[in-house]
Amino acid sequence: MKKLIIVILLVTSILVGCTTNELTNKTDTEELVFQPYLEIQKNSSISLGIHNVPEGYMAPAKQQGKVVRFDYMTNTYDYQDRVMKKYAYVYIPYGYETSTERYDVVYTMHGHTGDVTSFPGELDDLTDIKNVIDHLIEKKEMKPMLMVFASYYHDNVDMDTDDYDASLTEAFGKELQNDLIPQFENAYHTYASSTSEEDLIASRDHRIFLGFSMGAVTTWYRMMDSMRYFRYYVPFS
């Protein structure tokens, strides 16, 4: 439970932060992808801006979003060169079905031995993370956004590797660019006008890649190979 609360604090603080700095197509010079770094002296510390989850936020909100399964086709993109069917879990904010608005997307990755349930839980037994996000959106402390909980494991099945999944996290970039993003954003209302490479690149300001533990490693790899498709990257732990 303690680990879950820590993850809730990290994820919600990150998403609220991204809401504060709204995802837009502005090109003003003061709105940079990479802000100037701060030199950190030995024994110094910086504030992460993390606060306790407000009382009541872990209980169901009045305006509840939902979590659904999204199936898509992809490839192993390795020596197997095998076509496979995979799935992700998707958080859909309250009001999405009746809205004509476009939505930002957070692509989220679990850690070593995890899966698509690591953040949201099972479809019939969701974690408190969903409730917290519902409350943040309901109280307008966070923009309504779609969240895609994906997995780098082939066939959504945990695999034994001799590199703590590093090779899988690296290879996931091709699956993400070629299959998951186009198929998901073709099915949902996002800022991509179409699933052409040109339009996916043009809408990069409206995507975040977030990962925990080996998901953070996945995030660093995406900074290396997917910068055209994502503006925001959040590796943590």
Regions found by a protein language model. Give the residues of each.
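C-terminal motif of bacterial Sec signal peptides marking the signal peptidase cleavage site
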Residues: 14-17
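Short, linear, compositionally biased motifs with a strong N-terminal bias
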Residues: 10-11
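Positively charged n-region of N-terminal signal peptides that target proteins for export
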Residues: 1-4
